[in-house]
Each structure stands twice: as C-alpha cells, then as structure tokens.
Amino acid sequence: MEREIIQTLDGSTTIHLKEWDECYHSKHGAIQEAQHVFIKNGLTLFENKSVSILEIGFGTGLNAFITFLESKKLYQSIDYVGVEAYPVSAEEVLSMNYVAELNAEKEAMIFQKMHESNWNEQIKLSENFMLTKRKQFFDAIDDIEKFDLIYFDAFGYRVQPELWSTAIFQKMHNALKPQGKLVTYAARGVVKRSMIEVGRSEEHTSE
C-alpha cells in the first residue's frame, strides 16, 4: 500500500495511506490529538502514580514519546507496552518531526532509542520509564488484568472495522485492571456499544 508523509494542521507530521485515505493521526493535528485524547483524558487521570500502559497501535511512536515527556512533568513511573503488527520503516521514523515540534531536542535520543530497540524486549529509557514493543496482531493479545490504562489507537472503523469488534474490546477488558481505563479518539456508536457489551462504560472518547 502506497504511503506518504504529510504535515497535519498543527505542523506535526504523520503517515498517510493513499489507498485507504487514512492517516496514522488526525489531519487536524497529530500532536494535538495525542495530547488531548491520550494525555489529557488518559495519563493525567493517574497523576503521581506508577502506571502500566498498553498502546494498541505503536505506529510512529508519538504517543509513547509524548507519554515519556509528560510522565517526567508528572513524576510518574511508567511501564509502557506498545503493540504493532506492521512497524513503520526507519526512513519514515526519520521523517517524523515530533522532537522539534515538541521542543524536545534534549530527548531526541529517547525517541531514536524507542524505534531502534528490539521488538519483544523490555528496555529502560530512564529511571522511571520502561518500554516494551510487541510485534503482535491485536487479536493475539491475551494479557489478564495487567494494565491501568489502554491507549486504543488502531486505524479507524471505516477502514478496519474488525479492529473495533466486541471480540477485540473483550480482550481490552481482560487486559485492564479492575479500575483501569481505556481511551480512544473514536466516538462512533458501534465503539461505545462494544465497550458497554464487555462491561466498559466509562471510557473516554474524543473525535
């Protein structure tokens, strides 16, 4: 599938899949979306705590990188697991301008290390941030009550409805601790219904 790097409205870059006319992030702003959906509605709910996070769709690493930056401000200890079936290429990673757009030049090596680290191995990015990238299909996730927070950032329902099925959300429900939260950018009715069917009615969604 043909891919291209585009600039979103907030100046940050993303990957556009031409055949699907689908982007890895919102065209209105990749960084803006990550900060609003996953940080404001997710990470900040766990201030001053140790937080275990599962990201569904590691992609360009933007959510992981912003989480790293924000966790330093919030004095959080993070155990981050990012699941991705189709990793982005090294060339695409180099085209992402997140370090500059986030004024995070001092942490440029962290973003690089996130992508250069081996799959399926836990690495220590700092004293308070552990990262594991799992090369895995979403329907193979079998964690049980392991995570405080899930960033559900799969491609949209329009192009991959199977990723938004009740079966997938049952796996998400199983992976969350009893008081865990799932956050996602999508607010479609079918998504909310799937969440409710598996007993998760408190998730935060944002379009």
Where are these regions (language model features)?
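Conserved beta-strand signature within the Rossmann-like core of class I S-adenosyl-L-methionine
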Residues: 149-151, 178-186
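A short glycine-rich, Lys/Arg-flanked "PGG" loop and its adjoining helix->strand segment in the class I
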Residues: 162-179
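Residue-level detector of conserved catalytic or cofactor/ligand-binding positions
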Residues: 202-207
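Local beta-strand N-terminus motif with an aromatic residue
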Residues: 50, 146-147
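Glycine-rich SAM-binding Motif I of class I
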Residues: 61-65
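A short SAM/SAH-binding and catalytic strip from SAM-dependent methyltransferases
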Residues: 148-163
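S-adenosyl-L-methionine
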Residues: 92-144
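Rossmann-like AdoMet
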Residues: 1-51, 68-102
